[in-house]
Amino acid sequence: MSNAINEIDNTDLVFVFGYNPADSHPIVANHVINAKRNGAKIIVCDPRKIETARIADMHIALKNGSNIALLNAMGHVIIEENLYDKAFVASRTEGFEEYRKIVEGYTPESVEDITGVSASEIRQAARMYAQAESAAILWGMGVTQFYQGVETVRSLTSLAMLTGNLGKPHAGVNPVRGQNNVQGACDMGALPDTYPGYQYVKDPANREKFAKAWGVESLPAHTGYRISELPHRVAHGEVRAAYIMGEDPLQTDAELSAVRKAFEDLELVIVQDIFMTKTASAADVILPSTSWASMKACLLRLTVASSVSSRRLSRSGI
């Protein structure tokens, strides 16, 4: 997040895209409500009439899969009506002419059928966002876990740069992560293709550096497998065992029938958790884990600020 969460209270406009803080992040939702009380306009973009849309000044109920068309049409309106921040674009961005050419063909009228949103609504949303003194965009898993995720994030951040809504108080772009300390886990390298600090596995210099730091001769040059690849890799004998910590793939992953078949074929499944999850029920070995209340730990929050939690309960697990 480029904003502190409490900055949302005093922004002039909140653009909530593919995200329902009322259900998934109640504390963030409270700050959106505070902004509303302080006079901010709220735009919610979601196919469903989600809880957060109930307090919105405008709910854009776009069709599934039409994110890019909608956002490019908003960019088209902002440029066409001369609502963009010329000084910011000239001094602090690159590629404006390329972006202009991309959105030139996305008139609001041309995307009405694609998005299910009227041209007048698209123009209204673009004007509201561009004319706000400060505007904060919030998006969540509805964006990042969608097949257009990367392109949608680029389109949202392009709107922020187009209007100068970066680098000033109460304005910014804010991807809201899905689970506790997921920011810290990713920062520490709990990803299939990076070491700590998002240093890529495929870079020989990074492999050499971490091999030296970890006291080993060398590290593999290939990246790890993504969770979505598990059924395929198990079927081809490339994965024979799984060690799962704080995750429940037999409950939450896509294509559950394929995932169940993969777990049946694994030679060894170890689950470390504080709950008897569905995945734990299918495990060969269950390791009781220590909860956050039983350990002293450092966490990284949504805003990339660190916080320390103190032990409140006696330790009863790993």
Regions found by a protein language model. Give the residues of each.
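Cofactor-pocket helix-loop regions in the catalytic cores of large enzyme subunits
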Residues: 1-181, 185-188, 200-318
